[in-house]
Curated annotation (Swiss-Prot):
Region (Disordered): 1-38
Gene that encodes the chain: ATG4
Superkingdom field: Eukaryota
GO cellular component: nucleus; phagophore assembly site
Species in which this protein is naturally found: Meyerozyma guilliermondii (strain ATCC 6260 / CBS 566 / DSM 6381 / JCM 1539 / NBRC 10279 / NRRL Y-324)
Keyword Phosphoprotein: no
UniProt family annotation: Belongs to the peptidase C54 family.
Gene Ontology MF: a single term: cysteine-type endopeptidase activity
Protein's name according to its UniProt entry: Probable cysteine protease ATG4
Pfam families: Peptidase_C54
Length: 402
């Protein structure tokens, strides 16, 4: 079964919501006759459509530019068609149980999030999740960073020119890129993340890398993965193609610093973009484009049943967030199909303040991932979690509360 989320998430403006043009205000003495009134309405509709297509700011979606009023031959919105092509991973309920760890949060600590969510009907369809305190059968309340990371990965595979098999992202332990395996990889690592604990961007990046490496060892998954800490990209590490570059970033303290605004938009504008997993305070979102200073995103905080079909991985509905309201912690994805792509990326991002290109890495450098990169949201007192954020330094702090 497929859920239609258009009504919940649709925020794009219709022509009726756009500012009226001067032709909309026609004095009474020009409307005395019915024929002239109809002619005026016809002319108004023509000029309004023309005005909207000229004055509306262009919409940029993963390196391609569209006008908000653009329509295809069938009259469908070109922007919404492009949005629907993106892969959207969201909360799921009723999946294969993930056993609670004795040192981790309990499933019932997320009951409030399970009940008060954006798809209450899904909650009642999976009522057992409200009484099982031994197993996680939904990621509502804690899995949004994993879902947006899955979105980056799925869209990266698509951007690399390969068909995306959504079964690889199914919520079972046998699926290569499932939530179950994201949790397992992190749990088996020295970080020892537990089910129900939140992933930071650095941890999400490393988990994607390990899952892709494991999958490549047994089956032909097209992507290799490089994690580029601090936005540093080294020529001598770009060896195989296609390659997914993951950049765990922190671009400010409470909000994205103004100095990075244009550079951040550029990461969504280049044709190599795979999107950004990040968000606003208290949630992680999948950003795939922008219009003006408004970032366009797909929201993972919409629970769907695990049995929902292929259509549930797409939606033509999206929301907007002004860049000034964006949380500074995020993970950006860039896909390089070949060396020409890499050369083009370097040319397009000359002067970018986020990514930096180097000929070779100093191999005395190393990446240290802190245990605090995982935050336990199973605590009843969330203020303790919020207080912990202040103790993190700018390098290891990748904190968003789900």
């Amino acid at each position: 079964m497929t859920w239609d989320t258009k009504n919940q998430f649709e925020t794009t403006k219709t022509s009726q919501e756009l500012p009226a043009t001067s032709q909309d205000h026609i004095s009474d003495n020009k409307m005395n006759s019915e024929p002239s009134h109809r002619l005026s309405q016809f002319w108004s509709s023509l000029t309004r459509s023309s005005s909207e297509s000229i004055t509306a700011e262009p919409v940029v979606i993963l390196g391609h530019t569209y006008r908000e009023g653009d329509r295809d031959r069938e009259g469908d919105s070109e922007v919404q068609k492009q949005v629907k092509k993106r892969y959207w991973m969201s909360y799921r309920s009723g999946f294969e149980p993930i056993k609670k760890h004795e040192d981790g949060p309990s499933p019932l600590s997320f009951v409030q999030s399970m009940i008060f969510n954006k798809n209450v009907g899904n909650t009642f369809a999976n009522i057992h999740s409200l009484v099982d305190n031994d197993n996680f059968t939904t990621d509502v309340g804690w899995g949004c960073m994993i879902r947006t990371s899955q979105s980056v990965l799925a869209n990266a595979i698509d951007r690399a020119g390969y068909e995306v098999d959504v079964e690889l992202f199914a919520d079972t332990s046998s699926a290569a890129f499932s939530l179950h395996n994201f949790v397992k990889v992190a749990s088996d690592s020295p970080l020892r993340v537990r089910p129900g604990q939140w992933f930071g961007p650095s941890a999400a990046s490393l988990s994607i890398k390990r899952l892709c490496e494991a999958r490549n060892s047994s089956t032909n998954v097209p992507l290799s993965v490089l994690v580029c800490e601090s936005g540093d990209i080294y020529d001598d590490q770009i060896q195989t193609f296609p390659v997914l570059l993951l950049l765990p970033l922190r671009l400010g303290i409470d909000h994205v610093n103004n100095v990075y605004h244009s550079s951040l938009l550029q990461l969504l504008e280049v044709p190599q973009s795979a999107g950004i997993a990040g968000g606003k305070p208290s949630s992680s979102l999948y950003f795939f484009g922008y219009q003006g200073t408004s970032l366009l995103y797909l929201d993972p905080h919409y629970p769907q049943n695990v049995s929902a079909g292929v259509g549930s991985y797409h939606s033509s509905s999206y929301q907007k967030l002004d860049i000034s309201d964006m949380d500074p912690s995020m993970m950006a994805g860039i896909v390089l199909k070949n060396n020409e792509d890499y050369t083009d990326l370097k040319r397009r991002t000359t002067g970018n303040k986020i990514i930096h290109f180097h000929e070779a890495r100093n191999y005395n450098d190393y990446v240290e991932v802190e245990r605090e990169d995982f935050i336990d949201l199973g605590q009843n007192n969330r203020s303790a979690t919020a207080g912990a954020e202040a103790d993190f330094d700018s390098e290891s702090s990748m904190v968003i509360v789900d």
